[in-house]
């Protein structure tokens, strides 16, 4: 019988489980020697898009640059976007200048004159006369009513006459002729003239004198 060299209750080394070799353990350290720091850290700050302004100041700068570009054209429109954190603001803009390049090359008198077209029921004033708004209408009784806006005109400054040569009704003030209404019926007479609250109302009726003279 061989003696127990491990003492009482002992066990042989061959019965112990094999401990893992250090070479089999994963290397938790990175190249810098910090075991708790991963090699590649994610970039927590996303890149801001370069194609949109990053602040209101950048947007104002872009608008000023656009104004400089359209100085000769006189008009520009477009759209853009402002990024403010997680919010995005889309906008449209339109810029116009009141005077175009031709205003710098010539006087206002050199510009071509554009006359407004005549509309039915509204009589335009001849060139050189003060522009006022005049309307005419026919009543069921055959009367013709002329209504004119005369701001700043007093009753004693107004004179209404019939121009038989041109078959027109003339409105005159101390400044001259302010309106002329063509008449398609020359045989008319003024029956009533009223100026109330700077609104002139003239009533015209047709006369039968010419027809009566022809029948005799």
Curated annotation (Swiss-Prot):
Name of the protein: Gas vesicle protein H
Protein family membership: Belongs to the gas vesicle GvpH family.
Naturally occurring in which organism (per UniProt): Haloferax mediterranei (strain ATCC 33500 / DSM 1411 / JCM 8866 / NBRC 14739 / NCIMB 2177 / R-4)
Domain of life: Archaea
Up-regulation conditions: Transcribed from early-log phase, decreases as cells enter stationary phase, probably as a long gvpF-gvpM RNA. Highly expressed in 25% salt, poorly expressed in 15% salt, no gas vesicles are formed at 15% salt.
Gene responsible for this protein: gvpH
Biased composition range(s): Basic and acidic residues: 38-51, 73-84, 107-141
Miscellaneous information on this protein: Encoded in a 14-gene locus called mc-vac.
Quaternary structure, from the entry: GvpF to GvpM interact with each other in vitro, and may form multi-subunit complex(es). Interacts with GvpC. Might interact with GvpA.
Purpose: Proteins GvpF to GvpM might be involved in nucleating gas vesicle formation. A minor component of the gas vesicle. Gas vesicles are hollow, gas filled proteinaceous nanostructures found in some microorganisms. They allow positioning of halobacteria at the optimal depth for growth in the poorly aerated, shallow brine pools of their habitat.
Statement: the UniProt record of this protein carries the keyword Ribonucleoprotein: no
């Amino acid at each position: 019988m061989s003696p127990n060299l491990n003492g009482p209750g002992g066990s042989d080394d061959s019965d112990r489980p094999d401990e893992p070799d250090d070479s089999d353990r994963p290397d938790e350290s990175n190249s810098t020697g910090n075991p708790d720091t991963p090699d590649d850290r994610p970039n927590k700050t996303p890149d801001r898009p370069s194609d949109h302004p990053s602040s209101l100041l950048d947007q104002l700068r872009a608008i000023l640059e656009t104004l400089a570009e359209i100085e000769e054209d006189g008009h520009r429109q477009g759209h853009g976007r402002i990024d403010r954190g997680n919010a995005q603001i889309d906008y449209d803009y339109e810029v116009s200048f009141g005077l175009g390049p031709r205003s710098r090359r010539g006087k206002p008198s050199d510009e071509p004159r554009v006359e407004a077209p005549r509309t039915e029921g509204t009589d335009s004033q001849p060139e050189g006369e003060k522009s006022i708004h005049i309307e005419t209408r026919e009543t069921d009784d055959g009367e013709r009513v002329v209504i004119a806006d005369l701001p700043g005109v007093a009753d004693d400054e107004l004179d209404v006459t019939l121009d038989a040569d041109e078959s027109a009704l003339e409105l005159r003030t101390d400044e001259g002729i302010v309106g002329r209404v063509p008449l398609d019926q020359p045989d008319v007479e003024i029956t009533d003239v009223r100026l109330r609250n700077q609104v002139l109302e003239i009533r015209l009726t047709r006369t039968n004198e010419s027809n009566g003279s022809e029948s005799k």
